[in-house]
Amino acid sequence: MELKSTNKAFGGEVRKYTHASTATGTDMTFSVYVPPAASLAKCPVIYYLSGLTCTDDNAVQKGGAFQACAELGCMMVFPDTSPRGDDVADDDAYDLGKGAGFYVDATADPWAKNFKMYTYITEELPALIESNLPAAPGLKSICGHSMGGHGALTIALKSPDAWASTSAFAPICNPTECPWGQKAFAAYGVDGAAHDATTLLKAAGAAVYPDILIDQGLNDQFLAEQLGVDAFEAAAKSVGQKVSIRKHPGFDHSYFFISSFMADHVKFHADALNKKAENALVDVAVTDDAALAEFAKTAGKPIT
């Protein structure tokens, strides 16, 4: 893992790294905000997945997350949206290939060789972060925008024990029923139903998280054709999943919209991460009799 740049922000650091990925078979780039609290203890991590055409730079430069992360002691990780490189397959269209990995593992050529973004986000990158940065093991949440909102919701719904919470800005909620999703799933050779948030929530048959936060601009040019927020809302209602969908008149699909509500999402995840950390401490106190017995030997005694 190679550090490429560092910038101070709100008492912490914005760092950009590159590393050789075993999942994609390419060098991958990500950025991370390390809050000032990391100098004292390991911090919980929020993963932010970006949308079509983006790199890690878009949200870093325009998302407005750092002040809230600094105040609440959360690290935030910004992965790239696809593998890149001269030998990586691409398409002339903006919604396929580089910048459009859709957070799935492709099985069809020419994409199967490198486009393993599901494995990269769910396995390789968290392990890398927890091994090399002051990240609290297992304390992570996930959010995203548009294609990244699709990735955040589906990844969290498929593995609820791995994530404390999930949220999204203008997510692609029902990709099997929209042109973007249908095109990507067909090209990459993946089972769309296994990567459709609406379908996954219906299949769960019950609430998966205490709450899911979604912000949606009502002037979003993609709302009617591509996003499927109403379908996700209906699925949530049918299984008893609380979803806080906030619909905002006048807001579009851009980072002007995202930055207006980013702090709310950081707070939403910080609360969930803190609760998960507290529950983990309770679990240890209740179940780890050996640890309690060892602690009792030293209680009230000087430690040398």
Residue ranges and their predicted role:
Residues M1-T304:
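Non-catalytic cap/lid and distal C-terminal segments of serine-dependent acyl enzymes
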